[in-house]
């Protein structure tokens, strides 16, 4: 994996790119950090879409929280 400092820098750059109005497709296992910078997302479980919606809706979805936030 990447060092925490490098991950932090990558997310910072992704936010800056998106702030310019450029759409970013991000595939990432760190759901909490990814949803914090996302507008909309898809959550996969065993290769299938288990949920989709706004970042806020996904972060409050009980199934997503159970699977990805412990």
Task: Describe the role of every protein-language-model region.
Residues 3:
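ABC-family nucleotide-binding domains
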Residues 7-20:
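Helical segment within the ABC ATPase nucleotide-binding domain
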Residues 28-29:
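H-loop/switch region of ABC-family ATPase nucleotide-binding domains
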Residues 34-36:
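A short, surface-exposed alpha-helical micro-motif characterized by mixed small hydrophobic
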Residues 40, 52:
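Short, glycine/charged-rich "phosphate-handling" switch motifs in NTP-dependent
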Residues 56-59:
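Short acidic-hydrophobic catalytic motif
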């Amino acid at each position: 994996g990447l060092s925490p400092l490098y991950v932090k820098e990558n997310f910072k750059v992704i936010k800056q790119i998106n702030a310019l109005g450029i759409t970013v497709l991000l595939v990432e296992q760190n759901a909490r950090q990814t949803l914090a910078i996302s507008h909309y997302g898809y959550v996969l479980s065993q290769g299938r879409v288990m949920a989709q919606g706004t970042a806020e809706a996904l972060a409050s979805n009980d199934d997503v929280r159970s699977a990805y936030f412990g």
